[in-house]
Amino acid sequence: MSAPGADFDTERDLRAAQKAEVLVQALPWLERFAGAVVVIKFGGNAMIDADLEAAFADDVLFLRRVGLKPVVVHGGGPQITQMLAKLEITSEFRGGLRVTTPEAMDVVRMVLTGQVQRRLVTMLNARGPLAVGLSGEDAGLFRAQRRSAVVDGEPVDVGLVGDVSRVDPLAVADLLDAGRIPVVSTIATDEADPTQILNVNADTAASALAVALGATKLVVLTDVEGLYSAWPDRSSLVSLISAAELEAMLPGLDAGMVPKMEACLRAVRGGVPQAHVIDGRAPHALLLEVFTTEGVGTMVLPDEAAAGASSE
């Protein structure tokens, strides 16, 4: 604080003024989202960059401390690939899906629940002892049905891979009611064989969980700024899009963006008021999305809400 009568220090005092402006701007959003469930899909480069991972943990704990109810859902593709290579287990993708043999499934399970999740829980708990790890197989959280890939128009068996078909959110809801931060790894129990575990896509699992919890927001972290209408033209970043507009764009999107945007579409069509894709490479992007008027990335809204927002 400047002493009374002290000379104005431009750098110091403007920085303080900017911080005050940020706090003032955040207030209505703090009030609006008090008690709101926010499902965050953590992935991309933020999972393998220590500084970004630390910033993410700071953001999640901040959300919890100011009264929101964050739920973290994670995958672990790069870590799974690395471990499979280390163990000399063949790993290939068919039609965009990882071929998952029983041997590979053991590695998927080990990496997601024993490595990636443990690291996230540890980082969060270092900032406040609130995080609890859950697997999609715990308490019947995720059930899935096996699926195949499509290659050259033909179905191809990809092993122990499934689509989430049912969600029982009770265990997650109980943790939220207890003031905890659930950290969920995305494997699921096979609907047809409860003794078998399936590998499921983390984006679609996060979307299904957001719907089941009645979340206020789904936020998907990725490695681009958001959705582009004419990629790679960076000036074509879409800040707001309706569910109908997004559905029309899906067939022409880059393969890597399709599951993320489908997850957002399913979420808002399932009753989640807002879904977002944001750049996980930007430190504190999560806080910028939730607590600033401009937000970041791309926001997907139900058709009626998008029409109202566009006319404002």
Swiss-Prot record:
Q: In which pathway does it act?
A: Amino-acid biosynthesis; L-arginine biosynthesis; N(2)-acetyl-L-ornithine from L-glutamate: step 2/4
Return the EC number. 2.7.2.8
- Please state what the protein is called: Acetylglutamate kinase
- In which domain of life is the source organism classified? Bacteria
Which Gene Ontology cellular component annotation is one that this UniProt entry carries? Answer: cytoplasm
Where does it reside? Cytoplasm
* Molecular function in Gene Ontology: acetylglutamate kinase activity; ATP binding
Q: Which UniProt keywords apply?
A: Amino-acid biosynthesis, Arginine biosynthesis, ATP-binding, Cytoplasm, Kinase, Nucleotide-binding, Transferase
Q: What catalytic reaction does the record list?
A: N-acetyl-L-glutamate + ATP = N-acetyl-L-glutamyl 5-phosphate + ADP
Q: Which gene encodes it?
A: argB
Organism this protein belongs to = Beutenbergia cavernae (strain ATCC BAA-8 / DSM 12333 / CCUG 43141 / JCM 11478 / NBRC 16432 / NCIMB 13614 / HKI 0122)
Q: Does the keyword Amino-acid biosynthesis apply?
A: yes
Q: What does this protein do?
A: Catalyzes the ATP-dependent phosphorylation of N-acetyl-L-glutamate.
Which coarse location class applies to the principal site listed for this UniProt protein?
cytoplasm
